């Protein structure tokens, strides 16, 4: 059995051109011969792409052969090859260069109509696939998969995909507004006139570490997630999801602007409540300041209890009693009781009593360390001193966690831990011996967060009119 595939090009005047596509032949029906093979499908798509591109470019060239003002034919100065990388193969287009007509003044003597229209050598569709896939998996694996499923007649290298991703991400960076010290606009009188806002926004920020190149060690990546409680005008079937963001702290020059744009994309108003949860680091907290007049900055309970848990584990290793004879006194039970008391006071936001208890604990451990010379006691003393310093620096950000918990309010940023794992670890750390430059990691994170937020396709629609027209179908959520 033979198959012949034809493609018919119909011009605006109704004239038809028939183009023969690669013929197919089938004999006995077998599972392996059922339908088209991947190689045949790629070959057919490549041929169709070539015919469609030839007809499109020929129509564009014909529209510019005559002067639009006087109608006289333009002289051809020459032709040059215009290579275009598409999803269905690399195509070399013959691009003529026309001489401008003398009936009107022009800035240049000649022009190339195709070069003016096709300013980039990679089509948006292929560029979208390269950047989206490489944000979810390694550059090398992206090149292999694209080569496997698309009719690529020339090798696709990981370095090419990395360069394309960095160029596209840099375009995003150039669109980002200028950094500001404060993004609060207006006054209370103006804010009172605003419509009722949506539900509170909860923003959690944490950090992760990525291995640097050229023996530079590791550098920190700040990642976070913003959750909207509810939307007033949301439909019953509308599902509210958080938006993640990330940046390399030592490279990014606009961290506050970046976070503000994420919040604004979720409908942030100046009269809307915003809660920021962080680990208490100064660099992280500075990013959150002066973004909203209704903002509340809280210390993440997870980081508080994590430090206390370490102290409790260390306290179990200190001697039960210190001294001999009449001077002997209990240490371990007393220390454990003091730590539990400190945790209770911190849970209820009573930092004054917690600090007093910490000072008492330090005095007891200092005396015990001098009497026993025990290593665990000294280690516990150092940990208690560090905890006291931590609480003193962040005491104004320690709320009544118990009351918030009973009211159903967030006290910990567990959702941020999953965001850091999703944004950073899955692509850049776990099970992959990757080394990164700060610029390369930062630019990749900008693409990855937009892909995970399901905003990347809309970005390409804004850049390239006609790219993937919007349909009523719900987008498929990314799992990686």
Can you say where each PLM-predicted feature lies in the sequence?
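Charge-rich, acidic-biased intrinsically disordered regions
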Residues: 66-68, 191-192
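Short metal-coordination and nucleic-acid-contact micro-motifs, chiefly zinc-binding Cys/His arrays
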Residues: 56-66, 80, 93-96
